[in-house]
Amino acid sequence: MNTQLSRTQFQFQPFHLVTPSPWPLLTSFALLILTSAAVMYFNGYANPLGGSGALLVGIGLATTVAAMALWFRDVVAEGTFLGDHTILVQKGITMGVALFIISEVFFFISVFWAFFHSSLSPTVELGAQWPPVGIATINPFELPLLNTILLLSSGATVTYAHHSVIEGNRRGAILGTLMTLIFAVLFTICQGIEYLNAGFTIADGVFGSTFFFSTGFHGVHVIIGTLFIAVAFFRMLSYHLTDHHHLGFEASILYWHFVDVVWLFLFISVYWWGS
């Protein structure tokens, strides 16, 4: 009897068996509300709840953020306070992040494929030239160049923060991460200003659609990466990270460097060569 009782106190495998959680299902419903509301809003359909169509989009966004925040709270508790993230679990998470980034790479390859398919062999409908006739392109050496400087600077500061965490330099880690967040927010603001002042829209043929889809989807990745790093920043302030256990921060850094590299390709091909 005593032997059976003692065995229940130990885990005989290194994997983390996740307990039942409502957050994946609730996040799925929240995303369904958000995407459905966005489609209705973009196509001018009335809000079934009354009021502006943007209201339903806001509700979907708020519920999505709330569900994900509660989900991430449980993940942080499991990894930081309960010790469920063993070395093998951390290796699995790292592999999962790497595979996710690889899938994102192939997605952006398809975006660049669409761009070069249209730009390298423009049809007669486009005036047999690129940019198409009537399109006033954005000067790549104004806001796009500033955004490039901001994003590359953020890559440098987040790398500095990473090395500071490894070396136990708490002040340097906090400063580097804070500067990264500032650069990221400035990038998003500049991107919004660029969109507002652009001389074309997403409806202006293949040029407008490929431009706004590629840069806009990258902008969404920047916002996601900013939130990812912001979570790591607040965990850093709460003393959750150590010099040997900061997997969430490392994952956010890998994601951010991926965003940096994609932007370089966008700047060179879409903004510079494409204009």
From Swiss-Prot:
Q: Name one GO molecular function term.
A: cytochrome-c oxidase activity
* Pfam families registered for this protein in UniProt: COX3
Q: Which Gene3D superfamilies match?
A: 1.10.287.70, Cytochrome c oxidase, subunit III, four-helix bundle (1.20.120.80)
**Protein location:** Mitochondrion inner membrane
Q: Which GO terms describe its cellular component?
A: mitochondrial inner membrane; mitochondrion
Q: What biological-process GO terms show up in the record?
A: mitochondrial electron transport, cytochrome c to oxygen
Q: Where are the transmembrane segments?
A: 22-42, 52-72, 96-116, 132-152, 173-193, 211-231, 253-273
- Keyword annotations of the record: Membrane, Mitochondrion, Mitochondrion inner membrane, Translocase, Transmembrane, Transmembrane helix
Disulfide-bond pairs as recorded: none
Instruction: Give the first-level EC class, as a single word.
Output: translocase
Q: What Enzyme Commission number(s) apply to this enzyme?
A: 7.1.1.9
Report membrane topology: Multi-pass membrane protein
Which reaction is recorded as catalysed by this protein?
A: 4 Fe(II)-[cytochrome c] + O2 + 8 H(+)(in) = 4 Fe(III)-[cytochrome c] + 2 H2O + 4 H(+)(out)
Q: Which PROSITE patterns match?
A: COX3
* Function per UniProt: Component of the cytochrome c oxidase, the last enzyme in the mitochondrial electron transport chain which drives oxidative phosphorylation. The respiratory chain contains 3 multisubunit complexes succinate dehydrogenase (complex II, CII), ubiquinol-cytochrome c oxidoreductase (cytochrome b-c1 complex, complex III, CIII) and cytochrome c oxidase (complex IV, CIV), that cooperate to transfer electrons derived from NADH and succinate to molecular oxygen, creating an electrochemical gradient over the inner membrane that drives transmembrane transport and the ATP synthase.
Q: Which PANTHER family match?
A: CYTOCHROME C OXIDASE SUBUNIT 3 (PTHR11403:SF7), CYTOCHROME C OXIDASE SUBUNIT III (PTHR11403)
**Subunit structure and binding partners:** Component of the cytochrome c oxidase (complex IV, CIV), a multisubunit enzyme composed of a catalytic core of 3 subunits and several supernumerary subunits. The complex exists as a monomer or a dimer and forms supercomplexes (SCs) in the inner mitochondrial membrane with ubiquinol-cytochrome c oxidoreductase (cytochrome b-c1 complex, complex III, CIII).
Similarity field: Belongs to the cytochrome c oxidase subunit 3 family.
Can you name this protein?
A: Cytochrome c oxidase subunit 3
Instruction: List the source organism.
Output: Mycosarcoma maydis (Corn smut fungus)
Lineage, uppermost ranks: Eukaryota, Fungi, Dikarya, Basidiomycota, Ustilaginomycotina
Gene encoding this polypeptide? COX3
